């Protein structure tokens, strides 16, 4: 089961990716982790990426995509993988598609969490961190995990915010890239949808309503994955 996973910041994409990883026993691959791993191991690609990062630049696709391909060829990816956070735009989607095809790697499923931009932004700005345990979920805009006043809903501890969660300009910039249907991330999603339409539904496109809570979204996702011939959960 080889999956590309899309969703805007604030959609819970990372949480759902972790659930898929646990359920199906496939690695949840994120580009940031790939960069850090290559840099820490001192690979040729890692050294090249570090030069760009140290200068405050973006790592070019000519480095990022080979890193991703190397990761997808590792032993733990033989039974499948979930790629999260790439591609981020149409050009990357096109280049990744070409590279995967050249390597004989097929994408089986494209998952897209659908969420209105305003809701996604509110969810980011509504996040609250418990000083006792960051894993205690609190969000002033999500009823299921709304804090108890100004206290943690789980333990009653004090709550704080992350500065980047309150940076509206940064949030808007990320969302500008994601919601751009001409050149941005959503344009990349459309690219893979067009491939699916021309290729008898391969890759399979799964759209998820991101408005409900984590449990409901996960149940919808598992239900749709069970409808594929690639479903092989470990539990």
Task: Outline where the language-model segments fall.
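Glycine-rich phosphate-binding loop of ATP-dependent small-molecule kinases
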Residues: 1-235
């Amino acid at each position: 089961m080889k999956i590309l996973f899309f969703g805007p910041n604030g959609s819970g994409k990372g949480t759902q990716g972790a659930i898929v990883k646990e359920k199906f026993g496939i690695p949840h691959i994120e580009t940031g982790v790939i960069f850090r791993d290559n840099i820490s191991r001192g690979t040729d690609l890692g050294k090249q990426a570090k030069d760009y990062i140290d200068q405050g630049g973006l790592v070019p696709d000519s480095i990022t995509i080979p890193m991703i391909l190397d990761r997808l060829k590792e032993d733990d990816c033989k039974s499948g993988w979930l790629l999260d956070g790439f591609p981020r735009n149409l050009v990357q989607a096109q280049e990744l598609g070409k590279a995967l095809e050249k390597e004989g790697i097929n994408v089986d499923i494209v998952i897209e969490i659908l969420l209105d931009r305003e809701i996604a932004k509110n969810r980011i700005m509504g996040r609250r961190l418990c000083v006792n345990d960051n894993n205690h979920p609190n969000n002033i805009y999500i009823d299921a995990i709304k804090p108890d006043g100004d206290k943690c809903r789980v333990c009653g501890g004090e709550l704080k915010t992350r500065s980047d969660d309150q940076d509206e300009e940064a949030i808007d910039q990320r969302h500008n890239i994601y919601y751009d249907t001409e050149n941005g991330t959503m344009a990349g999603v459309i690219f893979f949808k067009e491939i699916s339409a021309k290729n008898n539904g391969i890759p399979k496109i799964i759209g998820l309503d991101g408005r409900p809570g984590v449990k409901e979204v996960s149940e919808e996702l598992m239900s749709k994955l069970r409808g594929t011939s690639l479903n092989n959960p470990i539990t």
